[in-house]
Amino acid sequence: VRIRRVHLEEDTGRSVHEGSYSYIDLNRAGVPLMEIVTEADIHSAEEAYAYLTRLRATLRALGVNSGDMEKGALRCEPNISVRTLAQKERGEYGTKVEVKNLNSFRAVRSSIAYELERQVGVIEAGGAVEQVNMGWDEDKQRTVLQRSKEDAHDYRIGRASCREKSV
């Protein structure tokens, strides 16, 4: 599996939405994190599971990460897409769906397998896969819509009430 890039980020916290209220949970704000982005070389849930297992072993051996997903030390947010034969011949990819907030390798494997089947079903029924963020419902063993990546209101963007100018 080829690695496209590795970069450092800082966790900013997370938004919690309950009814008509939104809250910001800053418990993880400022926590450094390393993001590893791979090329589209993984073609199945089993390949993803094997890659993550080797990656975690490498990170642990290097002493840079404990690899404990259940403690939030390692996260995986797979981008999954299915393409038609015509798209493959043109060198194109299908529309990607990102699955967020997975807390175990088993959840990664299960969510990828489910999402692949879901997308194939959509395409075979004549529909189009939408670019969205999905979550994983462990109890129902299925992905669930979190938000569309196309609607600004889904990102809770608001107008600032005051702004300062820098000179």
PLM-predicted stretches and their roles:
Residues 1-163:
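Basic, nucleic-acid-interacting segments
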